[in-house]
Structure formats: C-alpha cells, structure tokens
Amino acid sequence: MTGKVILVGAGPGDPELITIKGLKAIKEADVVVYDDLISKELLNYAKKDAELIYVGKRKGKHSFKQEEINKILVEKAKEGKLVVRLKGGDPFVFGRGGEEILELKKHNIPYEVIPGITSAIAVPEVAGIPVTHRKVATSFTVVTGHEAEDKKEKQVDLSKLNADTIVILMGITNLENLVKELLQNPKRSKETPVAIIMEGTTKNQRVIKGTLGDIVEKAKKENARPPGVIVVGEVVNVLDSQ
C-alpha cells in the first residue's frame, strides 16, 4: 500500500513558530526528510523509531540535488510510509515544494501541504521592520537573490521593480550585484535604507542597517553571511523614528 507525503513548512527559524498542524505531522511521521535551515529542535518531536533523513543544501557544503530528494520521497512513500518533508519557511516560497509535488503526482502518491510562516515577512517583523506601513509602504515584493543557473534568461530585474518594499531571500552572497541593480532603479538612491537580517527569529539573530550607498561595506565589515533576509525601503527605519 502506498503511503503519503506531507510537505510541512517549519517556519522562519524559531522552532516555536511552526504551526500546530505541522508539529502534529512531525509527531506522526514514519520518515522525516529535512532541510538545512529548519530548527533541529523540531526533530526531537519525531517518534523514537522515525527515520530522519537530512537533505540540506547550503553553499560551500555538500548539497543534495533536487532529483535525489524527489527519489527519496517517492521511494519512502512507496514503502507505505507516512513521510514528512520538512522545509524552512513555507514550502511554496522559494522552497521548490511545487517541483516535489509534481514528482509525487507523476507517481500517483497522495500528498498534503501544511503552510509555514515565511521568513520573507516574519524575519523583518521580528527585527522590528514591517514590510508595509501606512503612508510609507503600501506594497512589497519578495524576490530571490540568486536565480537558477539553468534559466534561459533572467526573470528578476531589480532596476525595474516598483514596490515600496523589496524583500530579497538568499541574497547575501550576491549583495554587491544586487545593490548595483537597485541603484539603477529610479525609485531608489544611495540614501535608500537597507537592512540585512541574519539567522532571523533565532537567538543568534543579527541585524545590519545601512543604505544602498554603504551597505556593501558594512556587510563586509560585520561579516554578513547566510542565512539571511535583505529588506530595501523606507520601512527599514520606520519604527525607529518615533
């Protein structure tokens, strides 16, 4: 009998920010296939005999290819197991959850998706930065800081984005290029506020604030490194001004 795969969003970092439904799924799972960026504390809730499989991806470390991860999910489900695919943030926000669902559908494997709190909103929020604020920002855009190398053409052009707030995920290692693009946007200037939030919502959270004119230098000086979220726009300082 075929099992089932549940994609669970683990939230932005703090283990207490997972949903009740997500935690319940972990407790019931026969197999937990987990990413690098999830809080390892969540694995303590798995059954004693549950199989825990690490499939993390991180620059500079061994990375599992998406095809390998897909294969694990399919094989374990075909063994009749209840499989939890535990992902940082939300499975469908730059989490490649859609690709995994398509693979499961190809093999007629039942699946469920349990949303998670995305780091795109929660990380700035916990750092005191709202992504929208009345009279300051009425729109926000979330983009990836590095696009897939196999894309035929670039889809994100920061020089043309008109949202009041731009949230960039996975962009710290590409910061210099991102800033160059943003400075070509008529809506931005060297004075536009920027924040880099590293390991957001956790006890190791660090925040670097600056402007498009000095953030690259500040990031180097303060040794900015992934994982992190970059926020661009007037909202960065809006709660500091009152």
UniProtKB/Swiss-Prot annotation:
This is Uroporphyrinogen-III C-methyltransferase. It is a step in the biosynthesis of both cobalamin (vitamin B12) and coenzyme F430. Homodimer. Belongs to the precorrin methyltransferase family. It comes from Methanocaldococcus jannaschii (strain ATCC 43067 / DSM 2661 / JAL-1 / JCM 10045 / NBRC 100440). SUPFAM superfamilies: Tetrapyrrole methylase (SSF53790). InterPro entries: 4pyrrol_Mease, 4pyrrol_Methylase_sf, 4pyrrole_Mease_sub1, 4pyrrole_Mease_sub2, CobA/CysG_C, Siro_Cobalamin_biosynth, Uropor_MeTrfase_CS. PANTHER family: S-ADENOSYL-L-METHIONINE-DEPENDENT UROPORPHYRINOGEN III METHYLTRANSFERASE, CHLOROPLASTIC (PTHR45790:SF3), SIROHEME SYNTHASE-RELATED (PTHR45790).
